[in-house]
Amino acid sequence: MLTGWGRTAPSRADVVDVDDASLAEAVASAGARGALVRGLGRSYGDAAQNAGGTVVRLASPTRGIQLDTSTGLVTAHAAVSFDELLRHLVPRGYFVPVTPGTRFVTLGGAIASDVHGKNHHVDGSFGNHLRSMSMLMADGATVELTEESDPELWWATIGGMGLTGVVVEATFAALRIETSRCVVDTTRIDDLDALLATMAEGDEQYRYSVAWVDLLATGKHLGRSVLTRGDHASVVQVTGHRDPTAYGPRMLAAVPPGVPNLINRASVKAFNEMWFRKAPRRLVGEIQSITRFFHPLDGIAAWNRVYGRHGFLQYQFVVPFGAEAALCGVIERVARSGDASFVAVLKRFGPGNPGPLSFPMAGWTLTVDLPAGARGLSELLRDLDDRVLDAGGRHYLAKDSHTTADSIRRGYPRLSEWQEARHKADPGRLWISDIARRLELIG
Amino acid sequence: MRNALDEPQTIVVLGGTSDIGLAIAAALSGPATRHVVLACRDVDTGTAAAAALDIGPAEASVVAFEATDTASHAGLVDDLAERFGDLDVVVLAFGVLGSQATFEADPAAAAAAVTANYSGAVSVGLAVANRLRTQGHGRLVVLSSVAGERVRKANFVYGSSKAGLDAFAQGLGDSLAGSGASVLVVRPGWVASSMTAGLDPAPMATTPEAVAAAVVKALRAGRRTIWVPGTLRLVFAVFRHLPGPVWRRMPIR
């Protein structure tokens, strides 16, 4: 049985482990329920599941990464993880152009979800840095794809949830860095209005910016948060640190299987209080490791188990600038419900890219974890969905596990354009997933 | 596909005019529900029931279904999947209670009731299970009865059909292990419904709504068997082991 990272709505599929040589055959022998490729299973909902059909897991080859130091271009196998990419690139003075909050995603998954990071307001999402893809099509042919060669298919694939074909290899532009450290400014902010104002004013001066919001705080503390902003450190800034390009993240702990739900109002409240209090009121120029700044949760293996057998949802949406009232309404509503787990993440997006299903667009994006077993969750989510959609916002498919086909149609007005491009690439409807069935993505 | 809150997209009630079946459909319907399909013998009654059903934004449909026409069942399930997509929850809610006195006077009528309650359920249950296995997900909810747990002389024809159904459903559930699909066997006690209208309530009587609430909870928890109310499990654990002479003299109808 397969689930996403949220451990909800399991379904059974024929899981086939393949390498590049056996991929085409495994896909061709899929039955009426179609096929899908799965990476590291970090999308939260049912995006990497295919109930009753074939799910292909592509093996990552041993020499899967080539860095061209004259151009800064990286060509890597789609099954290569960001963990492997960073271990290869950072000591050589390069960084991935965009990283999500975990390094345990594959390159293929990053393209399928068009992932974004703390630098979206400056650099856009991962697809903006992609130069070419090698893709297995539904008819068995392998095509070399660039934005120029087939813009329709290119942008349908970026953020296309793996439903246009199997990306086997991709080339992207890496970011030159001097060190493996980040220089970070931290500010503790007491309420929501101050947070939005501070972010709107100062974000442009930083490559990376994100705020962690305590969604259990209410009243005058509503939206109290810790804002961290920074950039890669230069060699000068890390003078005195040993080996400026050293990079070797380690696992610190693991959550064992079968733990009961540890997330309740008391535990979350205590955690958030501790976390808010321990943050400095204002700290400038702190040197942090890449792992601490970008991937703090990756040190704890299987942290998704702390929600017990019901699992959890990660609710992420974006509303355009100007819809701050809706954003505040959502935050207030979640705070009132008391269901939010740990700190939520608020981030300002820059403009989106041409991908019809690519999630980011200019505006505010908020991410909040909610235990799936919480009472009244269905009503809460419906209320939040209405607020988001009425404000012209939308939901992130890589996170979604609850919303409806109507919500997606409203949030992604170019869905039919994507469906046409997809249909051209796969008229026989080979590529399919549980999320595609649930949200009626394939027209 | 059901979502992370276990809200089904498509619900099918076999025996679509059954009070318990309708209550389960209403209780399971959420914001994500697209279709509620009532499969019943009498389409007109089903249409009226569909109109009265509170299922939010979901669309109610009525299709013809005859439990005793076992040859039609596989085709019916195929049609349902063709028309409504993956079947997330199928509720097997049909059944006839009949009258023990009538059955004893008319053995052919008894056989007809048993055919509907048991053979019909076997045939459509297998057809549904095949579909769910193909899908790799889905739940079949089977309305059994405590009447089948230890059969009473006052309604042993009905009770024996439910005993058979209960055993069949348990075996079917076991056969689906590892397929992604599963079976929930529901054993209600005496339920105040149109099936029991005019009869005196038995002790620990319950309502269709209470059965529905218990079913929703059990599906979320991934249970395989439930009793409604739950205390009946203990009561029947005792009843099952009473010596025959005592059981025959029990003052229960």
Predicted features by range, described:
Chain B
Residues G178, V185, D200-A237:
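C-terminal helical subdomain
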Residues G125, S161:
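Active-site helix of classical SDR
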Residues A32-A48:
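Conserved glycine-rich Rossmann-like NAD(P)H-binding loop of the short-chain dehydrogenase/reductase
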Residues T17-D19:
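Conserved glycine-rich cofactor-binding loop
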Residues S145:
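Residue(s) in the substrate-gating loop at a strand-loop-helix junction
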